[in-house]
């Protein structure tokens, strides 16, 4: 069962300050927990994300809110507590959704591409019995992240943050596709040019649908 609620972001803003993110996590989690536990469950384990990535220095204070709730639920239910990173959670969700969880028990490494507002990483994933997955970044964006390019373009077009869903809808209405440009060096890329190109198209009065399509095509390229 899934219960979720987006954190509120003011119109025209491109995200939340960390202090505001902690506040809204703290405020909204009790309501979500009430929805989730409207009936009893026989839990064997509680999992939570302790950090954005499994990398030294990867830290965001809002993860402490989730960790505290997970620890409380674990103690109350007598369930095991399992921690991992937000990035590993995305990879596990992808494996689960495509019916490939068996890859975790294989001795063969695999590649994953994690694109979000904070990451655009090409990852070498090696199954590990203790850690589930050992992750090594082998490529990705050297500057702007894919989600940042999408959200910054969307906010400039007047969309509400996060902008991905609405930008994709606008892109589907485009009738004049603009050939995407990409700056690639081996397994790494640079996405900062996408933002500049999209802003230039907006200033030139290009249709919002065409700008949206161009932005998404560049990120997906």
Placement of each model-derived feature along the sequence:
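N-terminal beta-alpha supersecondary unit
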Residues: 1-44, 48, 52-54
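Conserved phosphate-binding catalytic cores of ATP/NTP-utilizing and phosphoryl-transfer enzymes
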Residues: 79, 83-110
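Short glycine-aspartate micro-motif
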Residues: 45-47, 62, 110-114
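A short helix-loop
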Residues: 1, 105-108, 114-116, 121-209
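Phosphate- and other anionic-substrate recognition elements at nucleic-acid/protein interfaces
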Residues: 32-33, 40-42, 51-81
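Phosphate/ATP-binding catalytic cores across multiple sugar-kinase/actin-like superfamilies
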Residues: 31-36, 214-221
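Acidic, glycine-rich active-site loops and adjacent beta-strand->loop/helix elements
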Residues: 49-54, 85-91, 119
